[in-house]
Amino acid sequence: MKTQRIFPGIVLIGFGLYFFLEHSQIEIFPDFYSWPTLLCIVGAAFLIQAYSGNEFESILPGVILLGFGAHFHIVKNLEIWPDNIGIFILIISLGFILRARKTNTGMFHGLILLIISVLFLFYDKITTSFGLVETSTANIERFWPFALMAIGIYFLVRKK
């Protein structure tokens, strides 16, 4: 981090506001005073650092922390919000895509993760739309973890 004052300043302001509201017994929404809120505060600090300090590498951790914190709050309060791994992959892919818009690196990885997250989120609808037979669906479910690992290994060992 080039500018060392923005991130800690935002974190301290956020935590101070969090503890002030907690001690004042002001309830924003149910379960506001829990660890997902702290994730949101740190994630927001990373994003503010990224955009105001022109340190765009902080976009990815900011989106991940803010997104995960928001997810854990939303999943408790909104029944239609999906609670599966697809949401986490979607949040990570959004982080890659937003960072790629500023740094011109990582867009491919973000799009791959976006496709994987959509497959996870809409797997049931996709299989029924294509009319896949139960046995072929079972085979896909059994081998997709290996496909994900193969893609990951490819990213690790490929040379630019």
State each model region's role.
Residues 1-160:
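Alpha-helical transmembrane segments and their membrane-interface anchoring/capping motifs
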